[in-house]
C-alpha cells in the first residue's frame, strides 16, 4: 500500500498523543534517549556478540533476562525460551500492550558475530536483525523504570524465540496459542527504519516434499524404473510456470533441492522445500490447493513415462508441512496504527513505508489483536548476510517512537484514557495453529 494511503488520524488519537507527548515526565524520558543512545549502541554490540542461532537462543535469553532484572523489572523464561517481564499498570481492568523483539538470528551455529567498526558503521552478522530491536526494547524498559512512568494499562516486554526460518514463530505462537496470557495490543520491534509501519502480515506455508522409488543402475535399468529426481524435476517445471496475482502479492519458491546418491544410479530418493506466501489468507490457501497437487502429478508423470504400473516399483510422493505463518491485514482505524502514526508525527519522523511483511506480528494480527511492527532506529543493510551492517544515524528515534506509541495505547495514570480497547478472545478453535 503506498505511503499516501496511510491512515488519517482520528481526532481522539491526536488528542491522546498531544496529552502524552506534552507530559513533563514523558518529555524528560524522550529527551534522555538522545545521550543514552551511546549506551544503547554498546549494548546492541554486546547482544550481537552473544550467539543466538536458530533454535538455540538459550545463551542470549539468559543474558537478556539478567539485563532486564538489573534494570528493575522481574523477568522469567517460559517453557519455549521466551523472556517475559511485566510493568503493571495502575488499573488491572485497563489494556495490556506487548512490546516484543526476537532473539534469534538467521545464521548457523559457529558463525563469527564479532562486531567491526568502520566509517561510522557497525559490521557483523545479526548486528541489526535482531540485535537492534533487542537493544531498543531494553532502552524502553530503562526509560519507563528510571523515570517511574506510571501507566493505566500494563506493558508486557517479551524477547521471543523462533522468529527466523525453521523457528516458525514458535515463541510468539506460544504466547498467543497456549500461554493463557491476555493481550490487547502488540508492538513488535523489528528492522531499523522508524519511518516504516506495517499494516499487514505476509502469510506463508512451507512444505517438505519427498520422492522415493526403487532406484537402479543408470545404464542397466534404464527404462525399467522411474527416477525420484526426475519426478521432482517434472513437478518443479510445472511449478515454475504457475501464474500468480500481483495483487494481493502472492509468491512461490522452490527453495531447496536434494537427491540421488551417485552419478551412475537412478535416484531412489529426492526432496525439496517449497515456500508459498501471500498477503491474503484466502489467496494463500488457494495457492496451497493449486501447488501441492503438482508434486503428486510429478510422480505420476514419471511413472507414466516409463510405463511403470506395479505400485512397488513406482515413485511415490510424500508432502509434510514444515511451517505456517498466518496472513492478516489491519484496518485503517487500528489503534496501534493510529498511535504509531501519531507518535511519528509528534517526533517529526517521516513515514517512509506503509507495507506488509512477515514478523512476530503475524500471529496476534491474525487473531484480530491490534498489532504492528516498528523499527528500532538507525539504518541497516545486507540483513541476513555476513556483510550485514548498522549505522546509528538518529537511532534514538526507535526507542522514542516505541515508548510514545505504547504510552498512548495504555494511557498515563494522570492522563487520557488508553487508545487500546480490551480484546475479546476469539473462539478457542480459531486460536489453534493449523497448517
Model regions and ranges:
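Metal-dependent amide/peptide-bond hydrolase catalytic core
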Residues: 1-28, 223, 228-435
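Short beta-strand segments
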Residues: 100-102, 158-160, 186-190, 210-212, ...
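Short glycine/proline-enriched loop/turn "hinge" motifs that connect secondary-structure elements
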Residues: 107, 149, 198-204, 263-268, ...
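Acidic/His- and Gly-rich active-site-bordering loop/insert found
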Residues: 1-123
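Alpha-helical metal-binding/catalytic segments enriched in His/Glu/Asp
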Residues: 51, 99, 117-166, 205-211, ...
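Acidic-glycine-rich active-site phosphate/pyrophosphate-binding loop
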Residues: 103-117, 200-211, 342, 372, ...
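Short coil/turn connectors at secondary-structure junctions
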Residues: 80-81, 91-97, 111-112, 118-119, ...
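Acidic/histidine-rich catalytic neighborhood of metal-dependent amide-processing enzymes
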Residues: 126-202, 410, 414-435
Amino acid at each position: 500500500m503506498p505511503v499516501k494511503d496511510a491512515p488519517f488520524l482520528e481526532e481522539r488519537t491526536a488528542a491522546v498523543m498531544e496529552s502524552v507527548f506534552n507530559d513533563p515526565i514523558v518529555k524528560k524520558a524522550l529527551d534522555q534517549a538522545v545521550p543514552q543512545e551511546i549506551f544503547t549502541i554498546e549494548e546492541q554490540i554486546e547482544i550481537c556478540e552473544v550467539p543466538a542461532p536458530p533454535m538455540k537462543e538459550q545463551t542470549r535469553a539468559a543474558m537478556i533476562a539478567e539485563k532486564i532484572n538489573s534494570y528493575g523489572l522481574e523477568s522469567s523464561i517460559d517453557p519455549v525460551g521466551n523472556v517475559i517481564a511485566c510493568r503493571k499498570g495502575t488499573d488491572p481492568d485497563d489494556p495490556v500492550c506487548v512490546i516484543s523483539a526476537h532473539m534469534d538470528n538467521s545464521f548457523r551455529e559457529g558463525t563469527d558475530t564479532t562486531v567491526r567498526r568502520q566509517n561510522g558503521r557497525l559490521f557483523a552478522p545479526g548486528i541489526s536483525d535482531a540485535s537492534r530491536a533487542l537493544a531498543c526494547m531494553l532502552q524502553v524498559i530503562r526509560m519507563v523504570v528510571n523515570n517511574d512512568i506510571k501507566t493505566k494499562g500494563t506493558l508486557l516486554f517479551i524477547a521471543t524465540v523462533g522468529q527466523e526460518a525453521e523457528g516458525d514463530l514458535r515463541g510468539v505462537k506460544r504466547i498467543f496459542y497456549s500461554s493463557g496470557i491476555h493481550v490487547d495490543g502488540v508492538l513488535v520491534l523489528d528492522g531499523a527504519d522508524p519511518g516504516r509501519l506495517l499494516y499487514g502480515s505476509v502469510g506463508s506455508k512451507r512444505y517438505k516434499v519427498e520422492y522415493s522409488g526403487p532406484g537402479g543402475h543408470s545404464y542397466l535399468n534404464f527404462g525399467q524404473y522411474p527416477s525420484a529426481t526426475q519426478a521432482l524435476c517434472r513437478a518443479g517445471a510445472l511449478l515454475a510456470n504457475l501464474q500468480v496475482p500481483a495483487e494481493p502479492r502472492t509468491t512461490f519458491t522452490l527453495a531447496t533441492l536434494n537427491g540421488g546418491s551417485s552419478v551412475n544410479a537412478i535416484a531412489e530418493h529426492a526432496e525439496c522445500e517449497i515456500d508459498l506466501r501471500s498477503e491474503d489468507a484466502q489467496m494463500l490457501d488457494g495457492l496451497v490447493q493449486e501447488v501441492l497437487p503438482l508434486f503428486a502429478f510429478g510422480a505420476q508423470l514419471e511413472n507414466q513415462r516409463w510405463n511403470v504400473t506395479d505400485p512397488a516399483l513406482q515413485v511415490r510422493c510424500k508432502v509434510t508441512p514444515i511451517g505456517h505463518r498466518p496472513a492478516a491485514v489491519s484496518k485503517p482505524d487500528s489503534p496501534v496504527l493510529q498511535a504509531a502514526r501519531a507518535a511519528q508525527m509528534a517526533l517529526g519522523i517521516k513515514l517512509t513505508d506503509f507495507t506488509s511483511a512477515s514478523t512476530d506480528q503475524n500471529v496476534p494480527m491474525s487473531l484480530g489483536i491490534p498489532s504492528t511492527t516498528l523499527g528500532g532506529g538507525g539504518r541497516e543493510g545486507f540483513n541476513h548476510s555476513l556483510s550485514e551492517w548498522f549505522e546509528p544515524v538518529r537511532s534514538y528515534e526507535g526507542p522514542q517512537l516505541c515508548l510514545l506509541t505504547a504510552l498512548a495505547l495504555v494511557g498515563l495514570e494522570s492522563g487520557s484514557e488508553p487508545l487500546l480497547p480490551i480484546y475479546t478472545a476469539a473462539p478457542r478453535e480459531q486460536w489453534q495453529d493449523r497448517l
